[in-house]
């Protein structure tokens, strides 16, 4: 039995990046031998085991043979006769097909180290085309390492284009596509993911709504990142956040990343109309917390951008967004809308403060005070709306 460190841990160590997790491949072993040494089997489709102490993953060396459509149609051979080189051959990119033994020696049969030095993402073999998810994985790796100058090899891009044109991308599950998308959106240069997919002709099946206005979507996504970076720079200089509008406050870190993800995804989709945003979010099965913000931004963007809103317009905005009961969501909507407003050259700080002041004024209206005047039945709602309109109008006086 021989054990090798493989994949991302080797790659990132060679790039002097922080290694987050370690995966190992085991050559010359059987499942029974692994279990007898205290490992716990967790893999359903192929033998993967958790180390009894570290809980790190150890997978038996395996080969894969295409047997059907999509990313699940494979026959796996994980017998003890499978060699390390055979296991590495099935991997997607050469930079992910480097192994390291327990003495620190590299086993690199497919030139991954040289490709790392040349900042090149290149497929290991023609078997790359058997798994359509790899189009999205390569786009994600290109996104992650773009700041280091990595590019995709021409022959790999050609293969990705042929895979997209074959229709195989449509066989993927929404969950897998969204997972790759979500992870890419939290990288330093998230726009690269969509640029690569466009180059690979891979937007049509999952992101068709973006195709007609991709340049604007990417520009707005870049704006979101620029606002975050400016906030971080201000934070680093001052050591604390100043009293600044929501859009310039430092975002959550990518470890939790929920707020950052919402802001960036909203920036990407803000150019769409409401129905287009709904279609895209439903197709990808985006979680409600995120899709609600995106759809509201697309539905009410004209109200949010209009600096001449009447009290009736603002009340319609608050009612439509249920800002009364969902105040935290509305606050997050304003934060997420900032990149699009900046893209449109709007003084968002001033506009946001105006909207927030109007909402605060309307929230001061107490329905019990209205009822106390003797108003009854349907007239209560009418009187409540009128009182809110009067309160909103008063902030400009």
Swiss-Prot record:
Superkingdom field: Bacteria
- Broadest EC class assigned to this enzyme: transferase
Phylogenetic lineage? Bacteria, Pseudomonadati, Pseudomonadota, Gammaproteobacteria, Alteromonadales
Position of the signal peptide: none
Q: Which GO terms describe its molecular function?
A: ATP binding; CCA tRNA nucleotidyltransferase activity; magnesium ion binding; tRNA binding
Q: What is its EC number?
A: 2.7.7.72
HAMAP family on file: CCA_bact_type2
Organism for this UniProt entry:
Alteromonas mediterranea (strain DSM 17117 / CIP 110805 / LMG 28347 / Deep ecotype)
**Which SUPFAM superfamilies does the UniProt entry name for this protein?**
Nucleotidyltransferase, Poly A polymerase C-terminal region-like
Family statement = Belongs to the tRNA nucleotidyltransferase/poly(A) polymerase family. Bacterial CCA-adding enzyme type 2 subfamily.
Record keywords, A-Z: ATP-binding, Magnesium, Metal-binding, Nucleotide-binding, Nucleotidyltransferase, RNA repair, RNA-binding, Transferase, tRNA processing
Q: Which cofactor does it need?
A: Mg(2+)
For the keyword Metal-binding, the answer is: yes
Binding residues annotated for ATP, in chain numbering: 8, 11, 91, 137, 140
Domain HD: start-end pairs? 213-324
Show the PROSITE patterns listed in the entry: HD
This protein is called: CCA-adding enzyme
GO:BP terms for this protein? RNA repair; tRNA 3'-terminal CCA addition
């Amino acid at each position: 039995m021989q054990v090798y460190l493989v994949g991302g841990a080797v790659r990132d160590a060679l790039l002097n990046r922080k290694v987050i997790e370690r995966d190992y491949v085991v050559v010359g072993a059987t499942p029974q031998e692994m279990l007898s040494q205290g490992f716990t089997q967790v893999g359903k489709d192929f033998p993967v085991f958790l180390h009894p102490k570290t809980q790190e993953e150890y997978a038996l060396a395996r080969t894969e043979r295409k047997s059907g459509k999509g990313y699940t149609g494979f026959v796996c051979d994980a017998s003890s006769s499978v060699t390390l080189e055979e296991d590495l051959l099935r991997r997607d990119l050469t930079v992910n097909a480097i192994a390291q033994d327990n003495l620190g020696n590299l086993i690199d049969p497919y030139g991954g180290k040289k490709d790392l030095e040349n900042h090149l993402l290149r497929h290991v073999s023609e078997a790359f085309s058997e798994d359509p998810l790899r189009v999205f994985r390569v786009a994600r790796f290109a996104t992650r390492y773009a700041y280091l100058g990595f590019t995709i090899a021409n022959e790999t891009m050609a293969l990705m284009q042929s895979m997209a044109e074959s229709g195989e991308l449509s066989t993927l599950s929404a969950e897998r596509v969204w997972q790759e998308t979500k992870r890419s959106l939290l990288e330093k240069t998230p726009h690269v993911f969509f640029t690569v997919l466009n180059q690979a002709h891979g937007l049509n099946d999952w992101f068709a709504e973006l195709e007609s206005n991709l340049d604007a979507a990417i520009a707005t996504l870049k704006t979101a990142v620029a606002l975050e970076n400016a906030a971080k720079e201000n934070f680093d200089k001052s050591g604390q956040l100043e009293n600044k509008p929501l859009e310039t406050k430092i975002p959550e870190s990518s470890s939790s990343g929920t707020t950052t993800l919402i802001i960036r995804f909203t920036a990407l989709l803000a150019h769409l109309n409401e129905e287009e945003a709904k279609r895209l979010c439903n197709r990808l099965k985006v979680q409600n917390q995120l899709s609600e913000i995106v759809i509201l931004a697309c539905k009410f963007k004209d109200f949010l951008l209009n600096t001449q809103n009447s009290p009736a317009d603002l009340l319609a905005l608050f009612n439509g967004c249920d800002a009364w009961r969902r105040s935290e969501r509305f606050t997050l909507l304003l934060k997420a809308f900032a990149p699009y407003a900046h893209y449109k050259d709007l003084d968002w700080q001033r506009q946001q403060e105006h909207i927030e002041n109007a909402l605060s004024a309307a929230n001061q209206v107490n329905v019990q005070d209205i009822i106390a005047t003797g108003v009854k039945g349907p007239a209560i709602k009418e009187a409540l709306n009128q009182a809110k309109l009067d309160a909103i109008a008063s902030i400009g006086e």
